[in-house]
Amino acid sequence: MPDTPYTPYTPYTPEESAALRRLADRMDVRDLVDRYLAGLDRAEFDEDWARSVFTEDGSFQFPMGGHDGVAGMAEFTAAMIGKWRRTHHVAAGHLVEIDGEQARVSGSLIATHLHPHPPGPGRPPEPFQVGDRFEGEAARTAAGWRFARLAFEVVWTRGTPPGRVHTHDS
C-alpha cells in the first residue's frame, strides 16, 4: 500500500466558521419548531417543556386565543390540546433568517386532530384538520434558541371543529 501523505488539520477560515455557525443556528431554530410540535403530539407540555421552547416573556398567538409569558404556558397548552384524543402536526417549508442573537422563522403546518370520542352514531367520523401558516421570532438564550413569539394563521380547515361536535349517547 503506497504511503499517503498526512495532511495536518487546518482550522476553518473566519468566513467558513461564520457560515457553519449560521447553518447550525438555522438547524437549531428548525429543531425548536419540531420540539414545540412534538411536545403537542406527545402531550408532554409541562413547565420543563414550556421553558424548553419559550423565553420567559414568550408569547403564543392563535386565532382562537393566546398566552403571554412562560408561566402558565403549559396549562394553557394542555387546555387547548386537551380537547382532542390525539393530534398529529406536520410542518414543512421552514424559512429561517438569523440576525445575530435573534431569528425569524416561518413555514406551513398541517395539524390533524382526533375528536375525544371514537366515530359512531351522532359523532363526527372524520378528524378535524387545519392548514396553518406559522411565524415566529426566536432569541438565543444561555440554554439555546427559544421562541419570543409564535403565531399561527389558519389558512383552511376540514372536518368538524371543536365546539360544534354534538354527541348523543344511546
Language-model segment annotations:
Residues 2, 104-106, 129-164:
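Short beta-strand edge/turn micro-motifs at domain boundaries
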Residues 40, 54, 109-111, 151-154:
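Short beta-strand segments enriched in hydrophobic/aromatic residues
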Residues 117-124, 164-165:
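Short, surface-exposed loop/helix-turn segments at secondary-structure junctions
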Residues 108-120, 131:
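Extracellular/periplasmic carbohydrate-active domains that bind, remodel
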Residues 1-46, 52:
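Short, low-complexity N-terminal intrinsically disordered segments enriched in polar/charged residues
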Residues 86-87, 127-129:
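Transmembrane beta-barrel outer-membrane domains
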Residues 46-113:
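A solvent-exposed, acidic/Ser-Thr-rich amphipathic alpha-helical stretch
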Residues 81-83, 121-126:
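Short, P/G- and charge-enriched loop/turn segments at secondary-structure junctions
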